[in-house]
């Protein structure tokens, strides 16, 4: 298949689909007597993606995607973490299968299984929850546990979580009742001391107690305009029984609790005891048990409402490089698109991607830190490109990432190293 541009032929060529000329688009791809532009190719890809996404609901079990379907969808956006993706795929499949068959009666009542995601910062907890919501096309909201307090104290009431879910569903109560709620930083509401205190802990144990009812299923009275400023408004009644709650947290220090427990069990003649310091955090977190979460500061009832525990591993250099370039919304693709809008090609060399990944690991920010690193590298270039029309390509290599030089600017017709 041949790519044609304005310099390849004297006559003007047009896209056979949208009718734009070769001068209005970046690329024209030639076929037998027809041409298609890059914009139409992208549009076709979007249509196919939407149909695939819609088709996922038509799979077996009358509309509930299979765990394998969910796993494959998660693979498109989340790199690595296969074990966590499998656990989530099965748990979410069972949850929506339970909803589908809940109205059909029968002797056995299926209980809800909320999910706890445990993993280091920047390992993909939030992204997994967001991708699940997209897969099922259900209302989704995120809440930060650190802002929550018991009702009557300064801070956000737990009912505000359901209000956000209602807003995400355009105040459609029926739709909101089948949504997904992701509560981040759940480890920050652990009990401040291992033994109950006589002083009231309104942002720790108090919030856990307040979340209990929501998570197990209750009818929450939700003020549509927020509770404290409009006391006269009518309340909406939302049944939380069928809302899937996914809680996530880094649980810094949990690995030490697990290591202590494992070491105690390994004591004895001939017992093999691995040095806890030599194990990765993710390896230890995989061995997490409810008793470890209790020791960390979660109350027994709260741990009981989160029967499914999925642990995420630390991301290594190889995984971070894949995250940079492989997912559908990969960071490299996003920045390449930004430069493409200015008719400039952005190129990252393989050693540059490795250097960026190493920097993220040094900063201990995981995948979340990749964007700030790339943004810092390209800031001055993005400032100049819109006003300098003679730039054709920007090349980022290892030396650029390590601060030894500026990104290389390839000019139209000649090359110049900035």
UniProtKB/Swiss-Prot annotation:
Residues in the signal sequence: none
Quaternary data: Component of the ClpX-ClpP complex. Forms a hexameric ring that, in the presence of ATP, binds to fourteen ClpP subunits assembled into a disk-like structure with a central cavity, resembling the structure of eukaryotic proteasomes.
Residues involved in ATP binding: 120-127
Keyword field: ATP-binding, Chaperone, Metal-binding, Nucleotide-binding, Zinc
A Pfam family: ClpB_D2-small
Listed InterPro entries: AAA+_ATPase (IPR003593), ATP-dep_Clp_protease_ClpX (IPR050052), ATPase_AAA_core (IPR003959), Clp_ATPase_C (IPR019489), Clp_protease_ATP-bd_su_ClpX (IPR004487), ClpX_bact (IPR046425), P-loop_NTPase (IPR027417), Znf_CppX_C4 (IPR010603)
Functional note: ATP-dependent specificity component of the Clp protease. It directs the protease to specific substrates. Can perform chaperone functions in the absence of ClpP.
GO biological process, one term: proteolysis involved in protein catabolic process
UniProt: Zn(2+) binding residues: 15, 18, 37, 40
Listed transmembrane segments: none
Similarity-based family: Belongs to the ClpX chaperone family.
Source taxon at top rank: Bacteria
Identification of the protein by name: ATP-dependent Clp protease ATP-binding subunit ClpX
Domain ClpX-type ZB: 3-56
Gene Ontology molecular function, alphabetical: ATP binding; ATP hydrolysis activity; ATP-dependent protein folding chaperone; protein dimerization activity; unfolded protein binding; zinc ion binding
Chain's gene name: clpX
Entries under PANTHER family matching the protein: ATP-DEPENDENT CLP PROTEASE ATP-BINDING SUBUNIT CLPX-LIKE, MITOCHONDRIAL, ATP-DEPENDENT CLP PROTEASE ATP-BINDING SUBUNIT CLPX-LIKE, MITOCHONDRIAL-RELATED
GO CC, one annotated term: HslUV protease complex
């Amino acid at each position: 298949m041949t790519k044609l541009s304005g310099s390849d032929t004297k006559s003007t060529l047009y896209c056979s689909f949208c009718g734009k000329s070769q001068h209005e688009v970046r690329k024209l791809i030639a076929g037998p007597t027809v041409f298609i532009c890059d914009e139409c190719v992208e549009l076709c890809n979007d249509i196919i993606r939407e149909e695939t996404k819609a088709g996922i609901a038509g799979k077996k079990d009358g509309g509930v995607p299979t765990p394998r379907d969910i796993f494959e969808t998660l693979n498109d956006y989340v790199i690595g973490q296969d074990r966590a993706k499998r656990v989530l795929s099965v748990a979410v499949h069972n949850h929506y299968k339970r909803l589908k068959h809940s109205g059909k009666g029968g002797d056995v009542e299926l209980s809800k299984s909320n999910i706890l995601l445990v993993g280091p910062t920047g390992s993909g907890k939030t992204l997994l929850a967001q991708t699940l919501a997209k897969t099922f096309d259900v209302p989704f909201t995120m809440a930060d546990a650190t802002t929550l307090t018991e009702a009557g104290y300064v801070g956000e009431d737990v009912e505000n979580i359901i209000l956000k879910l209602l807003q995400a569903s355009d105040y459609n109560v029926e739709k909101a009742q089948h949504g997904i709620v992701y509560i981040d930083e759940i480890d920050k509401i652990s009990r401040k001391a291992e033994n109950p205190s006589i002083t009231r802990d309104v942002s720790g144990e108090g919030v856990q107690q307040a979340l209990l009812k929501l998570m197990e299923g209750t009818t929450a009275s939700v003020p549509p305009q927020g509770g404290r400023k409009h006391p006269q408004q009518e309340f909406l009644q939302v049944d939380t029984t069928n809302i899937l709650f996914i809680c996530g947290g880094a649980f810094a220090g949990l690995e030490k609790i697990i290591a202590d427990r494992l070491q105690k069990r390994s004591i004895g003649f001939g017992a093999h005891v691995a040095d806890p310091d030599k194990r990765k955090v993710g390896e230890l977190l995989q061995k997490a048990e409810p008793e470890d979460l209790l020791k960390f500061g979660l109350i027994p009832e709260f741990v009981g409402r989160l029967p499914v525990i999925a642990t995420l591993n630390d991301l290594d250099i190889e995984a971070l490089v894949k995250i940079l370039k492989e997912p559908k919304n990969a960071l490299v693709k996003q920045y390449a698109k930004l430069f493409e809008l200015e008719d400039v090609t952005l190129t990252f060399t393989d050693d540059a991607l490795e250097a960026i990944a190493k920097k993220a690991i040094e900063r201990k920010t995981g995948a979340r830190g990749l964007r700030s690193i790339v943004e810092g590298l390209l800031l001055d270039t993005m400032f100049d490109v819109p006003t300098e029309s003679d730039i054709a390509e920007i090349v980022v290599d290892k030396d650029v990432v390590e601060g030894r030089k500026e990104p290389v600017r390839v000019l139209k017709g000649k090359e110049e190293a900035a």
